[in-house]
Regions:
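A glycine-rich helix N-cap at a beta->alpha junction
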Residues: 110-118
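Glycine-/proline-rich flexible loop or hinge segments
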Residues: 23-25, 54-59
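STAS-typified acidic loop motif
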Residues: 2-39
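Cofactor-binding loop segments of dinucleotide-utilizing enzymes, especially the Rossmann-like FAD-
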Residues: 28, 93, 120
């Protein structure tokens, strides 16, 4: 298995999935077709296993269809984790309560992950 890297654009996030267990999604997520955009990401994560997984989500905005794909991403990891440690660092801009609430919702939906929330200045 090789690392997966997708360069972000103004409307697509940068995605870095490393076999070391470091998984990052950052930027703005407004793809025209979220399902199509996430196909290689979900395919990669389906075959992935590591002793410890560290996820960092640092999105300044994502739409509803991306929200569903993120949940699928998390659920696949949760199903494959086999009692391994999964840390999820949810980044949000100071004052962006919607992004914080989105992270808190995911925390409820994937209770097996160790969530931390990190606020950063505008």
């Amino acid at each position: 298995m090789e690392d997966l890297f997708i360069q972000g654009t103004d409307s697509l996030p940068t995605v870095s999935l490393k076999t070391t267990g470091e998984l990052k999604i950052a930027g703005r997520a407004l793809p025209e077709d979220a399902v199509k955009f996430f196909v290689p990401i979900l395919d990669w994560i389906t075959g992935f296993s590591a002793e410890e997984i560290n996820i960092e989500i640092n999105l300044d905005y994502f739409n509803t269809s991306v929200s569903k794909q993120l949940l699928d991403f998390f659920k696949i990891i949760e199903q494959n984790r086999a009692n391994k440690v999964v840390n999820l660092k949810w980044m949000y801009e100071d004052g962006d309560e919607e992004m914080l609430e989105s992270g808190e919702l995911y925390q409820e939906l994937v209770p097996g992950f160790h969530f931390t929330f990190h606020k950063f200045a505008e």
